[in-house]
């Protein structure tokens, strides 16, 4: 079975994760895909495939004869999708021989356009896969799962000798909880790759340092007709807080290694308001400065409006895995050579986000990230090509070959 055929099947399984439930997995939907994957792994000869109580799928492929004592290499992808644009099941749409121009996404009224996504012109002649425009596609990260499965199927012909291989599919990556119950010992790999990137040929081992900030504002609500020097409008103090952050340090205005503050939720009235941010920066020192700047603004506003008016809670999420991967750069070298031998230019880029691999690297499992061929994740314009997925499979297989050469 081709990788894209698997993808078309997987995306129809509804698997959004949720930050609201506080459970692991965060949604029971994810077990639907997990059980399907366990069955497929067993059909592919992965006899010990199973899913645990937290919805982690594990499986192991024995080494080729003579390679039993070699280091263990793993491949990981995640089963959940974002919850945005995911209030009903996905309907994938295939467009053969895409012309590189505007493409109407079903009857949604949305148009996938090179004006918004300039790389689309480079996909001319390929077979494009999208949703119908009413949901995400779910290639993030079901494309990674499909590609790993296809790699396993290809290995069954025994043309690529290899040591012990370890496979895992995780829940809740999109809410930053993918590694929360990941059993590194059970997985068993010495090194691994996540397949959770974008363009085929992408190789990533630098990611954001990340934190979440919740800012609570407590006001004093007095009748507006008699509130002179008394009222403290929590909503206005919240606006003041946000105005004191650097106006250009937003996702829209930054790229590459530039960090940002992202205000993703705002709620409030006179009595109470809440701002929720994510804080991101590749550089650890700059990351600390960002957190301290929010603490300083909190201090200033409490001095102005009264103690307890502003309350800041910052929660660390993950760190830049570069400091771990720097000790095993052969993983990046293998991936780079693999891309070149598959006639795809290696694209080494910083991750403007995080992957399970970032946290797993700090749990003792060095784990850079590889591109799957997908684009425009987390929204209705998400897309991928059949050809890009095929290349990602070839690169993965070549990495295995080089790792055990």
Give the residues covered by each predicted segment.
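N-terminal capping segment at the start of a domain
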Residues: 2-28, 129-130, 318, 378-379
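A non-catalytic alpha/beta surface segment that caps or lines the substrate-entry region
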Residues: 22-70, 74-76, 80
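Short, conserved micro-motifs enriched in small and acidic residues
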Residues: 28, 135-146, 228-236, 383-390
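Active-site metal-coordination/substrate-binding segment of hydrolases
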Residues: 67-161, 169, 391
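Midchain, well-structured core segments that form catalytic/ion-binding scaffolds
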Residues: 112, 126-139, 171-295, 299, ...
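Phosphate-handling active-site elements
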Residues: 153-166, 247-254, 405
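Metal-dependent amide/peptide-bond hydrolase catalytic core
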Residues: 235-405
């Amino acid at each position: 079975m081709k990788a894209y055929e698997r993808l078309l099947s997987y995306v129809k399984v509804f698997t959004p994760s949720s930050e609201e439930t506080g459970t692991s997995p965060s949604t029971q939907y994810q077990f639907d895909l997990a059980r399907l994957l366990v069955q497929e792994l067993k059909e592919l000869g992965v006899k010990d495939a199973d899913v645990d109580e937290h919805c982690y799928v594990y499986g192991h492929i024995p080494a080729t004869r003579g390679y039993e004592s070699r280091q263990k290499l793993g491949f990981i992808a995640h089963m959940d999708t974002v919850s945005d644009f995911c209030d009903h099941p996905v309907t994938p749409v295939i467009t053969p021989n895409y012309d590189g121009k505007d493409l109407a996404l079903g009857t949604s009224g949305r148009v996938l356009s090179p004006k918004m996504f300039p790389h689309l012109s480079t996909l001319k002649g390929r077979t494009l896969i999208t949703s119908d425009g009413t949901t995400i596609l779910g290639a993030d990260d079901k494309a990674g799962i499909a590609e790993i499965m296809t790699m396993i199927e290809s290995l069954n012909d025994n043309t690529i000798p290899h040591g012990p291989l370890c496979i895992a599919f995780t829940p809740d990556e999109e809410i930053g909880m993918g590694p929360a119950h990941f059993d590194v010992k059970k997985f068993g790999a010495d090194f691994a790759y996540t397949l959770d990137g974008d363009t085929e040929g992408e190789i990533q081992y630098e990611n954001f340092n990340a934190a979440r900030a919740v800012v609570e504002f407590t006001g004093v609500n007095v009748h507006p007709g008699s509130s002179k020097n008394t009222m403290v409008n929590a909503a206005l103090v919240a606006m003041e807080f946000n105005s004191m952050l650097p106006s250009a340090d937003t996702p829209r205005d930054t790229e590459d290694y530039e960090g940002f503050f992202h205000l993703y939720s705002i709620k409030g009235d006179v009595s109470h308001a809440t701002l929720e941010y994510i804080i991101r920066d590749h550089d650890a020192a700059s990351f600390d400065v960002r957190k301290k700047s929010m603490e300083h603004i909190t201090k200033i506003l409490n001095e102005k409006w009264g103690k307890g008016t502003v309350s800041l809670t910052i929660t660390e999420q993950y760190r830049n895995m570069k400091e771990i991967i720097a000790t095993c750069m052969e993983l990046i070298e293998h991936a780079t050579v693999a891309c070149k031998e598959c006639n795809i230019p290696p694209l080494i880029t910083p991750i403007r986000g995080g992957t399970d691999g970032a946290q797993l690297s700090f749990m003792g499992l060095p784990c850079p990230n590889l591109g799957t061929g997908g684009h425009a994740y987390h929204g209705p314009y998400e897309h991928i090509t059949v050809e890009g997925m095929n290349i990602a499979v070839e690169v993965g297989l070549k990495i295995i070959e080089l790792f055990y050469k």
